[in-house]
Design a protein with these regions (language model features):
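Conserved alpha/beta enzyme-core scaffold
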Residues: 1-160
Length: 160
């Protein structure tokens, strides 16, 4: 489906890391907060845990549980998508764009936001702003485009 991605992966130019969605969000949030790492049970005993530090901690009931160390993400560049921005970089997200754009923006040294509309400073209702302009270094007014995805592939469920 993506021949260039396939070529880079097979030639060793590109690495793939498996990371559960919630763990990815927390890794970005941790990086944005300056937290170098955290322990989680998510992924223990799976491919996700291979090569990572394991440590046992007691749970709430005192039962020892194995956790894996996940490192915070500290990016050089974060590229995010927002619905609307004002001239000072305050952003408003819509729908599912509210999920990962905020932690993605904060974990990058430089944040570039592509937006659908730029309004004058002071035009956005402060109660509607999702990300303060202090986290945004550049705003790019995007052109309308069709959102294209690769072919959806799902695994059939086994029947009992």
């Amino acid at each position: 489906e993506n021949k260039e991605f396939e070529r880079q992966y097979l030639s060793g130019e590109l690495e793939v890391e498996f990371c559960p969605q919630g763990t990815l969000a927390e890794r970005m949030r941790a990086g944005g907060a300056g937290i170098p790492g955290f322990y989680t049970r998510t992924g223990v005993g799976t491919e996700v845990a291979k090569g990572k530090e394991h440590k046992d901690f007691p749970d709430r009931d005192g039962v020892m549980q194995t956790y894996i160390l996940e490192r915070g993400i500290f990016a050089d560049l974060s590229i995010i998508k927002a619905w609307k921005a004002d001239e000072t970089g305050n952003l408003v997200f819509r729908k599912t764009a509210r999920n990962f754009n905020l932690p993605a923006a904060t974990c990058g040294k430089v944040c570039v936001a592509e937006v659908e509309e730029v309004v004058p400073a002071g035009r956005l209702d402060p109660d509607h702003i999702h990300l303060a302009g202090v986290f945004v270094n550049r705003i790019v007014l995007g052109a309308p485009y069709d959102k294209k995805i690769e072919f959806r592939t799902v695994q059939e469920r086994e029947t009992a």
